[in-house]
Amino acid sequence: MDTHFEDYLDTQEGRNLPVKHCIKGTNGWRLCEELEGFEGRRFEKSAFGSVECGSYAALGGYDRVELAGLCTDICVISNAMVIKAMAPELPVMVDAECCAGVTPKSHRNALEAMKMCQVEVPGI
């Protein structure tokens, strides 16, 4: 989960993307109601990619990982690449229908880039 704090605008990301978002404890940070009860491991991350998520995937004994989320062109691609770097033999899949990018074009570009890096992207 993208997790930022009140000092977000003072961070490198905040200086380059000066839009306060996902401030911990706010409605914009919480999962939608439909996902609140979903069981599974959640990772709070204050950067685009999560090394903790990559380590968990690499050490978890999984036969594949599926990613979904926002933004395809920032966080989803970053986490797909972290997992591929930390667990190169672990198949990673991104469901394009369960993601969205900043723009339709950047969404598509990110999906194409992930596909080039051997991430499964059904329908692309």
PLM segments and residue spans:
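Active-site-adjacent betaalpha module
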Residues: 7, 11-124
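Von Willebrand factor
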Residues: 1-7
